[in-house]
Amino acid sequence: MAPKTTLIAEPELVSKSVNTIRFLAIDAVEKAKSGHPGMPMGCAPMGHVLYDEFMRFNPKNPYWFNRDRFVLSAGHGCMLQYALLHLSGYDSVKEEDLKSLRQWGSRTPAHPENFETPGVEVTTGPLGQGIASAVGLAVAEKHLAARYNKPGFEIVDHYTYVILGDGCQMEGVSNEACSLAAHWGLGKLIALYDDNHITIDGDTDVAFTEDVDKRFDALGWHVIWVKNGNDGCDEIRAAIEEAKSVKDRPTMIKVTTTIGYGAPSKANTYGVHGNALGPKEAEATRKNLGWPYEPFHVPDDVKKHWSRHIAEGAALESAWNAKFAEFQKKFPEEAADLKSIITGELPTNWESIFPTYTPENPGLPTRTLSHQILNGLGDVLPGLLGGSADLTLSNMAFLKNSGDFQKKSPGERNVKFGAREHAMGSICNGLALHSPGLLPYCATYFVFTDYMRAAMRISALSKARVLYIMTHDSIGLGEDGPTHQPVEHLASFRAMPNILTLRPADGNETAGAYRAAVQNGERPSILVLARQKLPQLPGTSIEGVSKGGYVISDNSRGGNSKPDVILIGTGSELEIAARAGDELRKEGKKVRVVSLVCWELFAEQSEKYRETVLPSGVTARVSVEAGSTFGWERFIGPKGKAVGIDRFGASAPAERLFKEFGITVEAVVAAAKEIC
């Protein structure tokens, strides 16, 4: 792609532009009476050089596919990004938006949120998440470029820029992700490290004395040090130009800055990190930096200089659209695939890949069924890619017809994350938020979601369609014992907003779970899968899963009859509920068996539908699930019984564990007899 037409302002105008950014941050935080002014004040030169001189974007179409991506990993410094979006001409950040920083219903929340503010690529705030998500954005660019670019057609060609701080560097997720970034040779990932040596607890000397340069050199990054980040725009510019010349590895530019630069008494102190300057210090800063303007004022010459980005951005997108039109004519199949990734449009008849299972089919673990369906989807969804945290064969989460995404084979679709669960989740967030039609999946044992929960929460908050394939879902994994046996995990994820927790029982339900995950484009999904072999049950269906809960058998239907008891199960325990129902029916009981495969989807159904599944007139209800009983009272009511596990597991064969913990047909039958 041709370089951006760069108009470097005269030094005096550059200085005025940088101070405009600083004072927009100061003024917004003052008005909000809370916030983080120090980081934007110190990083304003970085922001100016990046947005004004290097980044390619169209302010009037924040979602133009081939734009450069920017991630503010130090998300508390959000006013840096909001000021840059405002100056660049984004409609999402007008003056009134700056004035409503951190207020109810504003487009300028306390930390950048991709779903609130067009121009923000990923949600940041928890330190380290931003740089890790940025690795995902850079993976997306490298992968799509390898698959779709042709000689003369560099359709996918953009950079990912990040600003991160000392806190991000301390978080383990950043090191996990940066290790992978170097391993994969992400040459279009450029990170600028705000080296200001201040944390909330004081100087970084209290807890952070490592040599960051040497660490990143050891990881395999190209490292540059800009010693004067306070007003050294020329040095920052030269560093970014050098970084762009390095094609085979990511670059970390350490930029030494002064937090709160320009504030006479608060600069270089932790007091300017997370507090407004206060009226006196704000006024003193105006005098110190020679800023005579009223709050929120953008000088005319600064406004005029930045206004060119609107026309330049439109021209960049127009040129790309023309090139893509040529690409479509010459490479129609590749263009169609790429267009589906850009738009998120699902191909016609994509659901035809889902098999239908009957009780005559052999029983299989749901992780094996997942593998079959995942590969079927891989054949029809060009944006599907992902992998496992060093458990590929155990999770069975790989595409048979693809090789491994590596530095020298970036067009392949199997991603080996190594034992880095946290970074895996964050990288998948970046992949999902790069393009609507990218569908990243990642896999590990369900219990190890403890290592990646922060990333999964960001998935849910960001409306990122990430597919979490979580196997070994209960004591059913057997001898590995309580460290590997999830107990509380289902309950914890069911409590998390905007994420689907799907625990299928057999082939039909596994297919239904994948269908729901693909169709829900604005939330992640967790497929909770069993290691042990499970039968194909009568009465299960793909369509039933879409409703979250449904009846798989009932011998009371007809006339005004109603069941004596309702048995509710999920996953591997749905078979136990079904068999318990058969036993009770032999004794003359009218029994309904319900699969509650996804609580979230069931809660979204109409009250009328939910009543057809769990009629309020039937209070005798028993749930069975090999996990915590927490939350089941919502469905079984005050008169119901919950069969589950409210302690940690143990090391023994699975069959013995189910017996010892009372997750059996006999236990369900006994519980039912107590209440009906």
UniProtKB/Swiss-Prot annotation:
Keyword check for Transferase: yes
Induction and repression of expression: By rehydration.
Residues reported in the UniProt entry to bind Mg(2+): 166, 196, 198
GO molecular function, one term: metal ion binding
Known tissue expression: Leaves and roots.
Coiled coil: none
Reaction equations catalysed: D-sedoheptulose 7-phosphate + D-glyceraldehyde 3-phosphate = aldehydo-D-ribose 5-phosphate + D-xylulose 5-phosphate
Enzyme Commission code(s) on record: 2.2.1.1
Cofactor(s) required for function per UniProt: Mg(2+); Ca(2+); Mn(2+); Co(2+)
Residues that bind thiamine diphosphate: 76, 125-127, 167, 196, 273, 421, 448
UniProtKB keywords: Calcium, Magnesium, Metal-binding, Thiamine pyrophosphate, Transferase
Cellular component terms per the entry's GO annotation: cytosol
Keyword Metal-binding: yes
InterPro entries: THDP-binding, Transketo_C/PFOR_II, Transketolase-like_C_2, Transketolase-like_Pyr-bd, Transketolase_bac-like, Transketolase_BS, Transketolase_CS, Transketolase_fam
Origin: domain of life: Eukaryota
Active site, per annotation: 421
Its job: Could be involved in the conversion of sugars, which are a major phenomenon in the rehydration process. Catalyzes the transfer of a two-carbon ketol group from a ketose donor to an aldose acceptor, via a covalent intermediate with the cofactor thiamine pyrophosphate.
Subunit structure: Homodimer.
The family this protein is said to belong to: Belongs to the transketolase family.
Name this polypeptide is given: Transketolase 7
Organism: Craterostigma plantagineum (Blue gem)
